[in-house]
């Protein structure tokens, strides 16, 4: 039947070229999952499933969608001009064309970025994509004071040519990570008629494998049949009904029983050994972008002495803290997680293997040399129950070393502060920005590296900054938070699950048996 072009596809001769490109993309993606269970060509299409999140996603307006739950859902409905490759592991942080024909043309010493959009693209409501919609979307991010506003702070101006389908961004300074910004859901377009107000209650039309709908007050992802872009494969399941179940035991029990088809979020620590052994074929744990650590302020005694900071690093048992965090921590000894540019695995870690118990004897020796036994140290963190438990455990460890540790209220400055770093884009500077108070020169060095147009050289410089923070014991890395997904027996886990390092479970990859 003739009608308007199929969403996500080109028309005429361009459509033929697009289909060839899509076929190549599917072949390239088959079997390349580093985490997850793989995505095969024989994935079954159709059917419906139920998904439980561990907490409400908040606003699903792409200008505002920020938390892990919101971005997991929004990524399926709002593709940006660029996007991250639909793959697991390090490959999933690679920027590829999304709504744009190709990667940006960069000129003027890195200050001008020009994109050309694919022709014939339409939103989920059938309206055509226009270049000026991207200008409107950036205006919304700024007008709504979105958490994504900071990502676009370096944009001086943006111009659109609807006739040619071109968008030009002009930056105030070179930014080697701007491609990551253009691949975030904050950069995804919505029609120019969408108001400059939060539309999360009724998510606006977008372009992606799914469209978001509200059915009887419940969030539902509805597959866009025929959708496909060269770097964004179409979805498998027709309909995904999303609910919120904060009780981890109930989520696990209902998924194992088949009352739920998938659950995203932590499971009870006491249930993990059983799940990992009995349901290994449908349970996935993947380290994402989040790093957990204690930042050590060196502005006051005794933490201003590097020997005290080193002593604390030697004493830490990352596995023990992982148990406090419900078993969702992969031990590590860097600020940058493994899937972010600039990560280099230390060999060996400067303060011992993070998967082994801490070296309390070496820690005690350093404290004696620093004459710090009995010194007062304050410890702080966030208000959440898990944060409070980690802070208390850390204070107990310091007391065991002979320090007089005191836990302060959330928000009160402390000499040792628990941090969970999870930027919305895999940009090394975002991690180091959170630590700029530890070293006045860190922010300047990070700006210099981010402006470097050579990505390989920049990655080496990020690694150097990371290693310097760790070796000087400015931080106490505990490890990398893991995202977990449990699937029911209805899901074809052998062929149909991909864990993305930035967005978590890729819902478009899931299919039924």
Where are these regions (language model features)?
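Gly/Pro-rich hinge or "lid" segments in bacterial periplasmic/extracellular proteins
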Residues: 87-90, 181-234, 239
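N-terminal lobe/hinge region of extracytoplasmic solute-binding protein
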Residues: 52-108, 139, 205-206
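Surface-exposed binding/hinge segments that line
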Residues: 112, 116, 149-194, 213-214
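Aromatic- and charge-enriched surface segment that lines or borders ligand/interaction sites
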Residues: 102-146, 165-168, 254, 302-304
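Structural transition elements
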Residues: 327-369, 386-389
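Periplasmic-binding protein-like
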Residues: 299, 303-341, 469-474
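Ligand-site clamp/hinge motif
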Residues: 226-274
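Long beta-strand-rich cores associated with HINT superfamily self-processing modules
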Residues: 485-513
């Amino acid at each position: 039947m003739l009608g308007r072009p199929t969403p996500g596809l080109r028309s005429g001769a361009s459509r033929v070229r697009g289909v060839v490109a899509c076929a190549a993309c599917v072949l390239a993606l088959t079997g390349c999952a580093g985490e997850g269970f793989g995505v095969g060509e024989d994935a079954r299409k159709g059917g419906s499933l139920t998904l439980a999140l561990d907490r409400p996603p908040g606003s699903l307006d792409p200008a505002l969608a920020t938390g892990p739950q919101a971005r997991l859902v929004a990524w399926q409905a709002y593709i940006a001009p660029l996007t991250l490759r639909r793959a697991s592991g390090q490959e999933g942080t690679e920027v590829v064309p999304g709504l744009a024909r190709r990667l940006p043309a960069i000129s003027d010493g890195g200050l001008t970025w020009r994109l050309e959009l694919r022709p014939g693209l339409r939103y989920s409501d059938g309206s055509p994509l226009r270049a000026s919609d991207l200008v409107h979307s950036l205006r919304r991010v700024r007008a709504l004071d979105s958490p994504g506003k900071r990502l676009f702070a370096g944009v001086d101006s943006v111009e659109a040519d609807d006739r040619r389908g071109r968008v030009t961004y002009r930056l105030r300074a070179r930014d080697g990570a701007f491609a990551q910004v253009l691949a975030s859901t904050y950069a995804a377009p919505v029609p120019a008629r969408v108001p400059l107000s939060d539309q999360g209650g009724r998510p606006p039309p977008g372009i992606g494998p799914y469209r978001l709908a509200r059915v009887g007050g419940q969030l539902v992802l509805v597959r866009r049949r025929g959708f496909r872009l060269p770097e964004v494969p179409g979805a498998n399941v027709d309909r995904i009904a999303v609910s919120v179940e904060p009780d981890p035991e109930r989520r696990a029990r209902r998924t194992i029983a088949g009352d739920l088809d998938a659950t995203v979020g932590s499971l009870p620590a006491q249930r993990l050994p059983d799940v990992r052994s009995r349901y290994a074929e449908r349970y996935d744990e993947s380290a994402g972008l989040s790093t957990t650590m204690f930042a050590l302020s060196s502005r006051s005694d005794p933490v201003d002495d590097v020997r005290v900071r080193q002593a604390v690093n030697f004493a830490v048992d990352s596995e023990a803290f992982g148990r406090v965090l419900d078993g969702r921590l992969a031990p590590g000894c860097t600020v940058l997680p493994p899937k972010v540019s600039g990560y280099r695995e230390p060999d060996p870690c400067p303060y011992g293997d993070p998967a082994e118990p801490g070296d309390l004897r070496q820690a005690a020796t350093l404290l004696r040399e620093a004459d710090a036994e009995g010194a007062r140290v304050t410890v702080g963190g966030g208000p959440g129950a898990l944060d409070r438990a980690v802070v208390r455990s850390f204070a107990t460890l310091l007391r065991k070393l002979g320090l007089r540790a005191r836990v302060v209220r959330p928000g009160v400055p402390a000499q040792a502060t628990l941090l969970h770093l999870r930027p919305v884009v895999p940009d090394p500077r975002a991690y180091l920005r959170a630590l700029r108070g530890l070293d006045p020169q860190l922010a300047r060095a990070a700006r210099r590296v981010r402006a470097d147009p050579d990505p390989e050289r920049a990655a080496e410089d990020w690694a150097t900054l990371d290693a310097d923070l760790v070796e000087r014991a400015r931080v106490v890395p505990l490890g990398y938070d893991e995202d977990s997904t449990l699937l029911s027996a209805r899901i074809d886990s052998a062929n149909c699950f991909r864990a993305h390092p930035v967005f978590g479970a890729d819902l478009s990859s899931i299919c039924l048996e």
